[in-house]
């Protein structure tokens, strides 16, 4: 699957993104993706949108028919699946009701109740049995370890757990030796989980590099091969979250994404701290520097969060909302993110920290006309006023005022000022080159706004 394979590297998927220009494939322009082909965790199609879709007779579409829907689309010419931006515009009216029904069924089947990893019982490793004589001479070196193992006094598992617990700062030295010794053991003597738990604990707070990740992956692959079962199927969920932390620390985005998916399949949502780290890694790995094209960058990011819909219903932090806002391409997506955030215990703080990002996003989706941008700002403020019934925080007031003015809507800015006062720190009204004769956009509306500014 081209596109998804581009995300399959350890450090940064965007560096190998095969969709070089990020543009939708023209030969697939008229292909409407099925609901299960859409890779979007916060598309958030409302009942109103779906109802209007069924009632529209002329070019029925969703999200203005724009090619902004990340989806896996079957290319009949190449007989393969392409990962690209698609559009929800239906050429045949007869297919719409079936698509809406499939969408409802897919949404229902995709519902998954998660439990927080914070509520899981702590992993309990078996106590190591190391004789005092061995403890006194055991050192984290290949010569010392090989000599003790050859003596047959203690088990390999007990020895490595003791070393990792006693010398956590030497984990980088111990891990390659651990891999070499485990490869010598017969399957009946392999007990990876406790040792892996100790190793991951030892790496906490340390720098994880590519070599560390490769050694650990080989260790896990050997374990899976010997037992005939994938390690993610048998490891404790707490250890899986530790593994996710390890991969994130090493900037291994693909490994992190895969491990996150394993946790979700187990019905476990990582703790907020780990989720924040994952989203920050996503932002760092797929950046303007690594992928200059905006559309290709968005595709790569959406591929890494495509399965995160259950997480967003369970947990949204300020960091997550900021990164997700940067992935949005339509006001409907922003409104759905606000709706999801509104269900969180700390929703007001989360939204308040992202005031500027949310307002700037909805005010810039339409390059022109400015009227559409201002409509989007008003839609956002209407929803926010329901969340903040006692009045909008000053961050939203200031951001909305600036956005209205940069779009030339002096009248809307005046309404905000009359309700909440002139924002602190505002010293002048920007000059914008927008010609519009609608009420609120006229020169006399600007003059009225200037009067309000002078009289503050």
Curated annotation (Swiss-Prot):
Name where it's found: Mitochondrion
A GO molecular-function term, please?
translation regulator activity
One GO cellular component term noted in the UniProt record for this chain? mitochondrion
The main place the protein resides is: mitochondrion
- Tell me the keywords, alphabetical order: Mitochondrion, Transit peptide, Translation regulation
What functional role does this protein have? Required for translation of the mitochondrial OLI1 transcript encoding subunit 9 of mitochondrial ATP synthase.
Similarity remark: Belongs to the AEP1 family.
- Entry protein name: ATPase expression protein 1, mitochondrial
Which organism does this sequence originate in? Eremothecium gossypii (strain ATCC 10895 / CBS 109.51 / FGSC 9923 / NRRL Y-1056) (Yeast)
């Amino acid at each position: 699957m081209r596109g998804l394979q581009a995300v399959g590297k350890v450090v940064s998927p965007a560096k190998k993104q095969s969709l070089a220009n990020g543009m939708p494939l023209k030969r697939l322009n008229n292909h409407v993706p099925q609901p299960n082909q859409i890779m979007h965790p916060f598309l958030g199609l409302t009942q109103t949108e779906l109802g209007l879709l069924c009632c529209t007779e002329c070019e029925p579409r969703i999200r203005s028919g724009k090619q902004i829907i990340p989806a896996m689309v079957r290319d009949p010419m190449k007989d393969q699946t392409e990962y690209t931006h698609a559009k929800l515009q239906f050429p045949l009216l007869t297919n719409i009701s079936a698509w809406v029904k499939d969408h409802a069924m897919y949404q229902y089947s995709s519902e998954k109740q998660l439990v927080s990893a914070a509520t899981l019982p702590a992993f309990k490793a078996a106590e190591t049995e190391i004789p005092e004589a061995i403890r006194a001479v055991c050192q984290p070196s290949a010569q010392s370890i090989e000599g003790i193992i050859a003596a047959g006094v203690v088990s390999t598992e007990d020895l490595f757990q003791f070393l990792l617990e006693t010398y956590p700062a030497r984990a980088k030295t111990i891990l390659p030796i651990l891999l070499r010794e485990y490869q010598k053991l017969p399957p009946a003597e392999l007990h990876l989980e406790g040792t892996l738990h100790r190793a991951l604990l030892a790496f906490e707070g340390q720098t994880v590099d590519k070599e560390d990740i490769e050694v650990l992956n080989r260790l896990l692959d050997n374990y899976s091969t010997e037992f005939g079962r994938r390690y993610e199927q048998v490891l404790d969920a707490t250890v899986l979250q530790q593994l996710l932390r390890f991969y994130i620390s090493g900037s291994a985005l693909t490994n992190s994404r895969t491990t996150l998916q394993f946790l979700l399949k187990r019905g476990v949502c990582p703790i907020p701290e780990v989720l924040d780290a994952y989203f920050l890694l996503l932002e760092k790995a797929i950046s303007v520097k690594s992928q200059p094209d905006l559309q290709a960058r968005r595709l790569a990011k959406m591929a890494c969060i495509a399965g995160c819909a259950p997480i967003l219903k369970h947990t949204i932090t300020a960091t997550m909302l900021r990164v997700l806002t940067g992935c949005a391409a339509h006001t409907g997506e922003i409104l759905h993110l606000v709706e999801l955030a509104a269900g969180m215990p700390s929703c007001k703080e989360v939204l308040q920290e992202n005031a500027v990002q949310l307002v700037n996003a909805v005010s810039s989706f339409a390059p022109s006309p400015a009227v559409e941008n201002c409509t989007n700002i008003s839609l956002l403020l209407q929803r926010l006023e329901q969340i903040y019934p006692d009045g909008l925080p000053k961050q939203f007031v200031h951001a909305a005022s600036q956005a209205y003015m940069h779009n030339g809507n002096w009248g809307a800015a005046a309404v905000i000022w009359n309700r909440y006062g002139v924002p602190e720190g505002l010293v002048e009204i920007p000059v914008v080159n927008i010609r519009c004769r609608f009420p609120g956009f006229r020169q006399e509306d600007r003059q009225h706004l200037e009067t309000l500014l002078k009289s503050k």
